[in-house]
């Protein structure tokens, strides 16, 4: 009985340590190949052409990360093409505010699908940059953060 319990505990530890913690990453370059499998020998599935694009990392195998984007496209990218996430995408048209409050002065209208660079986040708000604008947006209105 003792051996069975030890074996089960060992298997649980191995299985849980092999699964990747879900996190967000961003593209490091303007052109990044997404592959069918975690190898340079694997065929290219499609190509991203947007630096800083946020992606959800859902798995890892050696030097490759399995990702999924906002539109549920998935594939494998080599870690040399990824960086720690600092960007998000708006999930709907929203107002950018001067301060982290819905009662603050509105600065700009941000369109759905806009790529934003995150400066910092606090509670339910993130301070972001978007072209010529810098301001605050609610975290529920953006994709690319682990809440």
PLM feature segments, named:
Residues 21-33, 37-50, 54-109, 115-117, ...:
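Boundary regions of SH3-family modules and the immediately adjacent low-complexity/disordered segments
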Residues 4-16:
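Sec-dependent N-terminal signal peptides
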């Amino acid at each position: 009985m003792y051996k069975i319990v030890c074996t089960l505990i060992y298997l649980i530890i191995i299985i849980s340590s092999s699964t990747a913690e879900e996190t967000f990453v961003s593209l490091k370059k303007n052109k990044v190949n997404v592959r069918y499998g975690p190898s340079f020998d694997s065929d290219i599935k499609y190509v991203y052409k947007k630096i800083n694009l946020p992606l959800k990392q859902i798995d890892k195998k050696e030097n490759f990360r399995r990702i999924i984007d906002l539109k549920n496209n998935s594939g494998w990218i080599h870690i040399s093409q990824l960086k720690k996430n600092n960007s998000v995408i708006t999930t709907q048209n929203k107002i950018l505010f001067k301060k982290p409050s819905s009662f603050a002065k509105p600065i700009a209208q941000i369109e759905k699908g806009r790529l934003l660079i995150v400066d910092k986040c606090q509670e339910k708000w993130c301070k972001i940059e978007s072209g010529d604008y810098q301001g605050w947006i609610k975290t529920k209105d953006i994709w690319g953060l682990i809440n």
